Amino acid sequence: MTSRLLTDDRLIVGLDLPSMEEARAMVRTLGGTISAYKIGLTLLARPGGVALAHELRDQGKMVFQDWKLHDIGAQVEGAARAVAEGGCDLLTVHAEPQVMRGAVKGRDAGGSSTKILAVTVMTSLSDADLTEIGYGFD
């Protein structure tokens, strides 16, 4: 009997693995039980990382490319357009106005329905980190 959790379309499995081989092995193991995958920066930056995203989409999977883009608006626009043209369902960017505007403009220019997710604060930041970068607490 298959668990409902493993067939729930809301479940996104993170391919936060160190190698393409391990990521592909996980996808093979999970087979048709999972319909959505997140590919993080480590795999996306490896040779074949973006190709893996395309392979998953070709298999009918929903693909979340977790780039967390953060640069000047024009650069984010170009990167978001490239990601959108290549096929992506969800794309992360940092939640700064020029970054988000650039991402939406690039996505739209790419003729895609890619959803843009804005990261407001990295969960890895401690209170001390936030104070150091100017977000002090009273």
Task: Label the model's feature ranges.
Residues 38-41, 52-72:
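Active-site cofactor/substrate anionic-group-binding motifs, chiefly glycine-
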Residues 1-28, 57:
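N-terminal amphipathic alpha-helix/helix-capping segment at the start of soluble metabolic enzymes
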Residues 19-21, 42-46, 69-74, 123-126:
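Short, small-residue-enriched loops and turns at beta-alpha junctions
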Residues 29-38, 86:
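Catalytic domains of carbohydrate-active enzymes, especially glycoside hydrolases
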Residues 9-15, 35-39, 63-67, 91-93, ...:
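Hydrophobic faces of well-ordered beta-strands that scaffold small-molecule active sites
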